[in-house]
Amino acid sequence: MVVNILVVNPNSSKSMTISLQETIEKTISKESCEISYFTGPNTSPPQIDGQETSVQSMKACLPVLTDDKGSIYYFQKFDGILIACFSDHPLVTELKDVAAKEKSNVSVVGLLDSSIQYCNLVGRNFSIITSNKEWIPILNASVQSKFLTGNTIDKNLWKGTVSTDLQVLALHSPDNFQQIADIIRDENLRKLDSEIVILGCAGFSGLQNKLAKKFEKEGTLFLDTIEVGLEILITMIKFVRSQK
């Protein structure tokens, strides 16, 4: 049976949504998933670069997804919702709370929680590469306070966050690829001794294979958070359906 998923880009950049769609269509079978895409309204920021814009985007998106039952984006019309922003985005928690109050079985995941849980299960050294420097303390605090297992902490597998010092929309530019690769080599691999590098921003979407090829000799695993988030979401949906 086909699962019905909504991918939410909580910022107002339509180009980012198009990039997400292009990446997803290359990796997820249309035979198994029907995927719709939502871009934040004009009241959402064009890019999310910290806590303030995260909250702003949540306040802009939540009413569109939960208030109008006739909307094509009404959350209960979907089996699952992926919030495509790499952060502890408040929209994830808010949607889960609304779903719980309305006793809905819709599954909701974000990119940060799903990718960190994947790394917890794999059990290898991992770190994050992100966009601007403002994200370093935010992501480190979120990961350390909410998402690490006891085993990951005991084995010191979590190595921290590295910034490219680039804005979100600049990450996808081919002109910046070498700069990103150099930072990963110097910081994530050599300095932090990471075996897994989480591509910690939706702006990295589609770069997983290119980076894997660049670092083939090192054997580094690059985690495309969109792909991991979707696969985990699909598994959650199938499990919920199996209980019916």
Language-model regions: role of each:
Residues 1-3, 241-244:
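Eukaryotic N-terminal targeting leaders
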Residues 3-28:
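N-terminal beta1-alpha1 ligand-phosphate binding loop
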Residues 8-10, 38, 128-131:
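Short hydrophobic segments within beta-strands
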Residues 37-63, 168-174:
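N-terminal beta-loop-helix "entrance" segment that forms/cooperates
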Residues 56-99, 109-112, 195-208:
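N-terminal glycine-rich phosphate/adenylate-binding segment common to multiple enzyme folds
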Residues 95-122, 214-233:
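Short, acidic/small-residue loops that bind anionic groups at enzyme active sites
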Residues 122, 188, 230-242:
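Short, hydrophobic alpha-helical segments
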Residues 130-202:
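Active-site rim beta-loop-alpha module in soluble metabolic enzymes
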